[in-house]
């Protein structure tokens, strides 16, 4: 199976080279795809390292960027990854194996199977609360609905429609396939300190998350 590692970026010039080099180390033949809305040298650095870059400027937000990043991937398996060095690329081969050999359509990594030292306690509690909402409303046994690292079977992506707006798209990208009956696996990872500054607006993300968890009940 061909592999694409898709990332959305905004001013990640401090981390992008390391992240791409780490990806090449564990998946040398993978397509690395960035949907980029940066004002710094993120896109230039990525292209120098052989990545395919789609410019999205002015920025349209997390949801539309991530939707484009997975839908324009050329691989049979699409790995999503935050470009800030917080996720362990070493698990990519295992994620691909779970899709290719074990038949899963989506592999979610969970940062919050225990409290990570790199995550503020308030964020940890919020993520566990979101996960509880997914369990109660959708019967989804998870500890992390907002993980930035997942593996998707591309044929599944092509069959699923989600609301591609707002910062809570990861919720739809997890809950909707579950409600449609696709095979899902969750594996624990160790979450690390990020390189650079976060662009996440926590209050907006919280509101969107609960809104999407509630509205996704309509999916069958």
Short names for language-model regions:
Residues 36-43:
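A conserved acidic beta->alpha catalytic loop
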Residues 11-25:
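Short, well-formed alpha-helical segments that are part of the catalytic scaffolds
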Residues 57-72, 89-167, 193-214, 218:
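Acceptor/aglycone-binding surface of glycosyltransferases and processive sugar-polymer synthases
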Residues 78:
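Short aromatic/hydrophobic "clamp" motif used to bind/position activated sugar donors
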Residues 12-15, 38, 88:
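Donor nucleotide-sugar binding loop of glycosyltransferases
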Residues 2-4, 31:
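Cell-envelope/extracellular polymer assembly enzymes that use nucleotide-activated donors
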Residues 141, 165, 175-192:
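Catalytic donor-sugar/metal-binding loop of nucleotide-sugar-dependent glycosyltransferases
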Residues 82-87:
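The conserved acidic donor/metal-binding loop of glycosyltransferases
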């Amino acid at each position: 199976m061909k592999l694409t590692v898709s990332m959305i970026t905004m001013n990640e010039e401090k981390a992008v080279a390391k992240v791409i080099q780490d990806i090449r180390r564990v998946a040398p033949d993978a397509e690395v795809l960035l949907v980029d809305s940066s004002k710094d040298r993120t896109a230039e650095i990525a292209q120098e390292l052989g990545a395919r870059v789609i410019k999205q400027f002015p920025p349209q937000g997390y949801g539309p960027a991530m939707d484009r990043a997975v839908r324009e991937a050329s691989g049979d398996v699409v790995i999503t990854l935050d470009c800030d060095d917080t996720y362990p690329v070493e698990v990519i081969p295992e994620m691909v194996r779970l899709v290719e050999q074990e038949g899963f359509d989506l592999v979610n990594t969970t940062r919050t199977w225990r409290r990570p030292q790199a995550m503020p306690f308030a964020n940890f509690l919020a993520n566990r609360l979101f996960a509880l909402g997914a369990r109660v409303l959708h019967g989804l046994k998870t500890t992390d609905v907002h993980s930035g690292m997942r593996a998707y079977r591309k044929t599944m992506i092509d069959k699923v429609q989600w609301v591609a707006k707002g910062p809570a798209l990861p919720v739809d990208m997890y809950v909707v396939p579950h409600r449609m009956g696709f095979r899902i696996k969750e594996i624990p990872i160790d979450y690390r300190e990020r390189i650079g500054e976060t662009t996440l607006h926590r209050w907006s993300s919280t509101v969107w998350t609960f809104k999407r968890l509630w509205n996704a009940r309509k999916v069958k």
